[in-house]
Swiss-Prot record:
HAMAP family: Lumazine_synth. It catalyses: (2S)-2-hydroxy-3-oxobutyl phosphate + 5-amino-6-(D-ribitylamino)uracil = 6,7-dimethyl-8-(1-D-ribityl)lumazine + phosphate + 2 H2O + H(+). Its EC number is 2.5.1.78. The keyword Transferase applies. Pfam families: DMRL_synthase. CDD domains: Lumazine_synthase-I (cd09209). InterPro entries: LS (IPR034964), LS/RS (IPR002180), LS/RS_sf (IPR036467). This is 6,7-dimethyl-8-ribityllumazine synthase. 5-amino-6-(D-ribitylamino)uracil binds at residues 11, 42-44, 66-68, 98.
Amino acid sequence: MAKFLIVEARFYSHLNDMLIQGAKQAIEEAGHECEVITVPGALEIPAAITMASDTGLYDAFVALGVVIRGETYHFEIVASESARGVMALTLDGLVIGNGILTVENEQQALVRADPQQKNKGGDAAKAAITMFNLKKKLS
């Protein structure tokens, strides 16, 4: 059994609750355990994963959050830099499922976050589980 850490950016709590529900369900159904920690926004997710990884307590991570396009350039920065930060950590060998949604509006986020619809939290957890199993096989 592996220990997964879900790191969620708690900016849109009602959407994140659904993402977490989907992720936890996927992890637990696969026979693993998980914990959840919260950070203020998507840009803080890579730093939190780095801090948690340094403890040696976790085998894999799931990054969850919602970034909704607004009227300023801020969306592009947050969407791009949070994805870049997560990707850099995976290239350094960490196992991370990226479930940071980048959407045009709240309705798109709702459909993607809902475990009964697109279930992107569950998908991110399943990606992390798959990569954890691959890393274990190749080690």
